[in-house]
Regions:
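A helix-coil-helix interface module used to build multimeric assemblies
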Residues: 1-149
């Protein structure tokens, strides 16, 4: 995204930090599913819920691995103990990236709908405010009788 054209709220959604947070959200949701199936002990899951991700650390590791998701998994693993072995269990990179992308799209869609709702209200208010303002009418591409907004 080009910063000067990006609204702050939309920029925050598509930031590297939020992208990695959504990746972590996906990873933890899968860990919860594994725990429900009895694969991951509940005590390990509770520790995994405290995992975090540092985007700068991910980028640092990515320079070595040349793989964003591997770098992410390692960076998250550094924030937990031996429970790190459960992170990314049974997943492909695409499972994480594509699912997180869907979450980002939903978040963006909600922002767009909220903003459109605000715009609708502004346009409605202006239409009511200026409903009696005269303007030149038009028909077949030429000026016609005066009308109001």
């Amino acid at each position: 995204m080009i910063d000067r054209y990006t609204l702050p709220d939309m920029g925050a959604i598509w930031s590297e930090e939020n992208k990695f947070n959504q990746w972590l959200r996906v990873e933890l949701a899968v860990c919860e599913a594994w725990a429900e199936e009895g694969v991951i002990p509940q005590s390990d899951l509770e520790k995994l819920k405290h995992a975090s991700v540092d985007p700068l650390r991910v980028k640092e590791i990515e320079k070595e691995t040349d793989h964003d998701v591997i770098a992410f998994v390692r960076a998250v693993g550094e924030t937990v103990g031996p429970e790190r072995r459960w992170i990314h269990l049974g997943l492909t990179s695409s499972d994480v990236v594509d699912t997180a992308l869907s979450l980002l799209l939903v978040e963006s869609g909600k922002l767009i709908l909220r903003t459109l709702s605000e715009l609708e209200q502004v346009v409605t208010d202006l239409a009511v405010k200026y409903k009696d303002t005269p303007m030149i009418g038009s028909t077949h591409g030429v000026h016609a009788e005066p009308i109001t907004f």
